[in-house]
A protein has these predicted regions:
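Non-catalytic nucleic-acid-binding/docking modules located in mid-to-C-terminal regions
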Residues: 46-51, 109, 151-153, 166-305
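Noncatalytic, basic helical substrate-engagement surface that gates or grips nucleic-acid strands
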Residues: 1-140, 144, 148-164, 170, ...
Length: 305
């Protein structure tokens, strides 16, 4: 199981009231919600391996260089070149992130981030490796761009309606919902646009036309090539719109697609048989008022051991 950590702790932060606090008054709603989500996922899906994937860089320079609008609306403060920009995050969430990562570590659950890359890239790399090895993989995220990693062995558990109502996206489910092969979802998103990521899309091409174009012609590179050669299979209307957006289409696929070629450190991602640091886990429970959530996590892990 590969989880998109930021996607989940943002959902936890907004889903659990900030009246949930530690004894010292610090809000711990995101920590509690995140921990409870993981316990629920482990209990329901019973993974034998688990990695919490991290955004070491939420807006990587290589993507911004290709498409400056990428996530630009979420920048709180630009930083010197070579350092990640500061993301606009709720003030009450920021101090909770180290706590939830400490809970993972003390429980013995693996986490992984790669400098210069997003969690999506870590997930895409680990999912591709596991798929090639013949392993079944569940990816947990509220980011639909990760539909692009779905295969016969890799399933996306989409959290858009919450953990209690996960949407299980397989190749057949993606085809039924969007009318496209799952590997072409990033191309579909490039054409349609995605304001949440700063993708403008191609003017005049909406979801229906994007679905038709991708299902008929394949990835963006093929669509652009057909438009440039004047292939009669493509309607003049679509050709005109594609050619008008040629500069955008030449770079956007590399922005949206998750990287599958990251160099990642070896890690023990097996579900732990016992707490890695039981004293620390107990201390976190006392300090932050998380004893009940930590006990649920322990119970979930023990049920698999």
């Amino acid at each position: 199981m590969l989880i998109d950590s930021a996607s989940m702790y943002f959902r936890a932060f907004y889903g659990v009231p900030d009246s949930v606090t530690a004894p010292n008054g610090m809000p711990v709603n995101a920590v509690r919600g995140f921990t409870d989500m993981i316990a629920t996922l482990i209990t329901r899906y019973r993974p034998d391996r688990f990695v919490a994937c991290l955004d070491n860089d939420w807006r990587p320079a290589f993507r911004v260089e290709l498409l400056p609008s990428y996530k630009a609306h979420r920048v709180l403060r630009a930083t010197p070149q070579g350092q990640p920009d500061v993301e606009e995050i709720p003030d009450l969430l920021t101090p909770q992130v180290p706590v939830l990562l400490a809970v993972l570590k003390a429980a013995g659950l693996a986490s992984l981030g790669v400098d210069g890359f997003e969690a999506d890239d870590v997930i895409a790399t680990l999912a591709a490796r596991a798929d090639a090895a013949g392993d079944q993989v569940d990816v947990v995220s509220g980011d639909r761009d990760l539909i692009g990693v779905v295969t016969d062995r890799v399933r996306l558990l989409y959290t858009g309606r919450g953990i209690a109502k996960l949407e299980e996206l397989t190749p057949d489910a993606v085809q039924a919902k969007y009318g496209i092969p799952c590997q072409y979802y990033p191309d579909f998103a490039v054409l349609r646009g995605d304001p949440s990521d700063g993708l403008p899309g191609v003017p005049g091409i909406g979801e229906k036309t994007a679905s038709i174009a991708v299902s008929k012609f394949g990835p963006i590179e093929d669509i652009l090539a057909l438009a440039q050669t004047g292939d009669p299979a493509m309607s003049p209307t679509i050709r005109t719109k594609v050619l008008a957006a040629a500069d955008y289409l030449a770079v956007a696929p590399a922005v949206v697609r998750g990287r599958t070629d990251l160099t990642v450190a070896d890690l023990d991602d097996s579900l732990p048989r016992s707490d890695a640091d039981p004293e620390m886990l107990d201390a976190l429970g006392r300090e932050f008022g998380l004893a009940s959530s930590i006990e649920r996590l322990r119970t979930a892990i023990a049920s698999i051991a």
